[in-house]
Amino acid sequence: MGQLCWLPLLAPLLLLRPPGVQSAGPIRAFVVPHSHMDVGWVYTVQESMRAYAANVYTSVVEELARGQQRRFIAVEQEFFRLWWDGVASDQQKYQVRQLLEEGRLEFVIGGQVMHDEAVTHLDDQILQLTEGHGFLYETFGIRPQFSWHVDPFGASATTPTLFALAGFNAHLGSRIDYDLKAAMQEARGLQFVWRGSPSLSERQEIFTHIMDQYSYCTPSHIPFSNRSGFYWNGVAVFPKPPQDGVYPNMSEPVTPANINLYAEALVANVKQRAAWFRTPHVLWPWGCDKQFFNASVQFANMDPLLDHINSHAAELGVSVQYATLGDYFRALHALNVTWRVRDHHDFLPYSTEPFQAWTGFYTSRSSLKGLARRASALLYAGESMFTRYLWPAPRGHLDPTWALQQLQQLRWAVSEVQHHDAITGTESPKVRDMYATHLASGMLGMRKLMASIVLDELQPQAPMAASSDAGPAGHFASVYNPLAWTVTTIVTLTVGFPGVRVTDEAGHPVPSQIQNSTETPSAYDLLILTTIPGLSYRHYNIRPTAGAQEGTQEPAATVASTLQFGRRLRRRTSHAGRYLVPVANDCYIVLLDQDTNLMHSIWERQSNRTVRVTQEFLEYHVNGDVKQGPISDNYLFTPGKAAVPAWEAVEMEIVAGQLVTEIRQYFYRNMTAQNYTYAIRSRLTHVPQGHDGELLCHRIEQEYQAGPLELNREAVLRTSTNLNSQQVIYSDNNGYQMQRRPYVSYVNNSIARNYYPMVQSAFMEDGKSRLVLLSERAHGISSQGNGQVEVMLHRRLWNNFDWDLGYNLTLNDTSVVHPVLWLLLGSWSLTTALRQRSALALQHRPVVLFGDLAGTAPKLPGPQQQEAVTLPPNLHLQILSIPGWRYSSNHTEHSQNLRKGHRGEAQADLRRVLLRLYHLYEVGEDPVLSQPVTVNLEAVLQALGSVVAVEERSLTGTWDLSMLHRWSWRTGPGRHRGDTTSPSRPPGGPIITVHPKEIRTFFIHFQQQ
């Protein structure tokens, strides 16, 4: 029965089983030396630098210089940059340049980290690649051309598009589901051309090599020794290298007495691998985690071993050579084999055994996941805010060098946390704290930069409060919209007075509402309705009113009233649904069951349909004792049985206002509990006439509270409906494209193996309606029943598995988390039109800068003083920034400068603006919004000045797109979807056309003022 789980996936592989080895002669093994260097995981970056990472580059550079035949690939940039900037001597830097020029040292991927593929957002993947590529190009003039994604826990269908756009010629991955990998090995299907996007099809395809069952490490066991094989430098020691140079588990040295045994072991492994691939070219990775910190002993043993094998190649049937990844792919490409095509499906979820589904990390350390995304959103806003400040001309006295330092600090922190043992929540507590500290420090610097920009814009109009016992006369709020569309939304502030008057730049009253704070009993939540053009500000004065609202002529924020409902026990009752309480706006009526205090149903106005919707919290009880069975940990989700309700009673209150109505539900573990463990705060907005509130009206905003959990509990929010979903949900790959997720019954562990990552959105549907969930952080998501969708919110685990205990990876997370989901309910056409923009409205909510005022109300700059940046609704401004790179955009000129010893300009280039545009829709998804969109960049960017030049670049900016010619790989009759030819590209110019799902990157140059 186990094989039935993967038989549907195996069938097309067997049908397409290719012919055997393409040429006679010995197998050719490409030995690729590498070190897998986690940017975090168990040890902090600084601990790793001290214990082994710095020594990797120091010793590898030294040893490569000693042997012309030797090779090495470097992957992540964070450790290399720290070594380059803080450790490397001038001589070592010279040697690195020589080795790169000779092709004996090769950078692959070239990003700051090796990012996770399941729970990262595409924007952040691009950022970390751009950070690494910019450094490599500026410093060496090189551009990575191959990926080495060997350790992320599953593979996303976004990956081929990402790496193709970055200019890569081939992609290498490893971790896919164990039974699928076994089937692909048997069918010799581990190499294929991957077309990740159904809309882009072959336009952004990439040749893909999936590593075999040995993955990125050499065989750890050899038959003639009880030590590991081929790891002559042993295992890295923390906190610092041993003084005697003796490390644990050092492989036996190669000697005349055992060289035949070593050769037989290596050759046997090469032949075993060769049987799983179609050509006689075999990739043999030499290395593993934390290897090559003593490259001298490594090469001193491998050199004679390879020489010995080559001297007996005829009888052994194998020849071997040191190689970079590029050497291997070039040899493979030269064979001109016809490869099968894989379509836009991903390789998620990932399992290593029947009871080892790596689906727990989709939710692990939810607080860190949320912090990482908030930091990313703040960086996104800060980039465009600084760009608008500098162009068309700086309007204040801000030091651009200091500003770039603040931006760079947060770029680095956001890039770092995309590592596959960072945002995944699979790191030790001290490493989690390192990531959080770096993010918090970067966010603090960014907020200082934003505040400086706003003050420069406003001075001297806005007097700030001086220190006084009397306290501030009121508050001042600047609200910035980082999206390139006009946004109407609610911003929430906390104030210390119950009566408030809010006015805008012209002194006009602004729709607002005051209510008791949900977090601070002595304070109040002030809700302000704001409409902000793209990349623009609104400024508000907030002052206490003279008295209560009644009896005064002064327009003030309306006061919300609270209706409370007593605590209700959880029970099945025939009386449910007798007394329904409606909460309505112009788009929805949410009906609440007064007998249960739970949501009962939602009526959607446009389709005039009522859908039964009930939400509750459940917990999976999981095992923590390896003697009792499979366990859950940071990585794995292994429930023993179905989830059970996590509450016995629920209270409800409705806070009703003219602007917003809030439904608050508090879930208690028992009837007499003093504190609730779970909560849902749902918000519907009543958009006043005269405001375009389509997105605002068509969403139910929900914030949850979960925790602290009891030990070995995994908490989910289950939403049950009467939609006939056939137990199919759709969830996104990295916020870029959706994947269909039908429920699959497995012999073992079906609950966990039907969990999928939701990075930004998910939905389920029937023939009439669709329920959409939008998220501001990653979660695990599943449908465990027809019409059901459950989102894992939080995990708290401990187990006695020695490996987990040794590395402190038990996830005893006692925190309280506050994730947010927005719900959209409606017809397919309505939700299709709104889903993408609503998801971005959640991810990139307006940034509020809040301060105290003194004296009379200041004169504020009006909206008419700002020119908006506005794009069509199907086109997203993915980035607008000033990277500050010092290199010339002309590759020939930059290369000449490097050869002359000029490492770029002395000052950062503030004139080059990076622009990236992204078409949000798939081909055929919407009759209007899926059409190609043409824009004139001169008109779109006129608020920043006069555009004098537009250069189209590769995704990370390092290639002039007209000079980028990626390899073409021969394919058979592939399953083509979407356009089959590349759209025409006019040579330069400001008028561009962006096709469905395209991402296009430009350097924009403006007229100097």
From Swiss-Prot:
Compartments where found: Secreted
Catalytic function, reaction form: Hydrolysis of terminal, non-reducing alpha-D-mannose residues in alpha-D-mannosides
Record carries keyword Signal: yes
SUPFAM superfamilies, A to Z: Families 57/38 glycoside transferase middle domain, Galactose mutarotase-like, Glycoside hydrolase/deacetylase
Signal peptide: 1-23
Listed InterPro entries: Gal_mutarotase_sf_dom (IPR011013), Glyco_hydro/deAcase_b/a-brl (IPR011330), Glyco_hydro_38_C (IPR011682), Glyco_hydro_38_cen (IPR015341), Glyco_hydro_38_cen_sf (IPR037094), Glyco_hydro_38_N (IPR000602), Glyco_hydro_38_N_sf (IPR027291), Glyco_hydro_57/38_cen_sf (IPR028995)
Annotated segments matching region Disordered: 972-991
Annotated keywords: Glycoprotein, Glycosidase, Hydrolase, Metal-binding, Secreted, Signal, Zinc
Record's cofactor remark: Binds 1 zinc ion per subunit.
Glycan attachment residues as annotated in the record: 226, 249, 294, 336, 516, 608, 670, 675, 748, 808, 812, 890
Needed co-factor(s): Zn(2+)
Entry GO CC: extracellular exosome; lysosomal lumen; lysosome
MF (Gene Ontology): alpha-mannosidase activity; carbohydrate binding; metal ion binding
Binding site for Zn(2+): 36, 38, 151, 420
Active site residues of this protein: 151 (nucleophile)
KW Heme (keyword) present: no
Catalytic activity, EC: 3.2.1.24
CDD domains to which the protein is assigned, alphabetical: GH38N_AMII_Epman_like
One record GO biological process: mannose metabolic process
Source domain of life: Eukaryota
EC class: hydrolase
Entry similarity comment: Belongs to the glycosyl hydrolase 38 family.
Protein name (Swiss-Prot/TrEMBL): Epididymis-specific alpha-mannosidase
Gene source species: Homo sapiens (Human)
